[in-house]
Amino acid sequence: MNTYLSTLLVLTTIFALSIIAYEWGINIIDTTLNQVSKEKEKNRIEIIKNLINDVIYSGVDSERTFDETKITLKENNVKISNGTKYVSFNITTIEGIDYDVYLEKGTLYIFIYNISAQCPNVYYIKYTNLSIYEFGGNITINYSDNLRHFYVNNSKVYVYSLLMG
């Protein structure tokens, strides 16, 4: 009887430990795959941002081709104000590419990318237009309900219109 119970106890313990090991292994694999996926998405966004910067530096009507397929566009509302003067507009951008802010010698430079795409499959990007807005004094940026305040002398807002297709 003792042999039977001890054998049953050993088999039950092995079974329980194998289930725990299986679940632990699945969790490790899921975590690793999620991390790899996040890293790939981060690299993809960085590649697209570099292409955007390259096409902007090349001037209006310049174009770059690339082999990206699916992109996710996101609608955003932007309001920029210094208390007396403000601009407000709706823009479309790629998920993960918002706006860039750069401060130099008391002037805040805000770079906003307004992207339109003819279809979800993207093979080129073209720089079509530029709008510039200047503000004096402290500035508030409300970018899709993400509010930021900057205490500066001057601000220049560059809105780059880009076409993807």
Curated annotation (Swiss-Prot):
Bilayer disposition of the protein: Single-pass membrane protein
Listed GO CC annotations: membrane
Subcellular location as annotated: Membrane
Keywords, in A-Z order: Membrane, Transmembrane, Transmembrane helix
Transmembrane segments: 9-29
Domain of life: Archaea
Protein name, entry field: Uncharacterized protein MJ1289
Organism: Methanocaldococcus jannaschii (strain ATCC 43067 / DSM 2661 / JAL-1 / JCM 10045 / NBRC 100440)
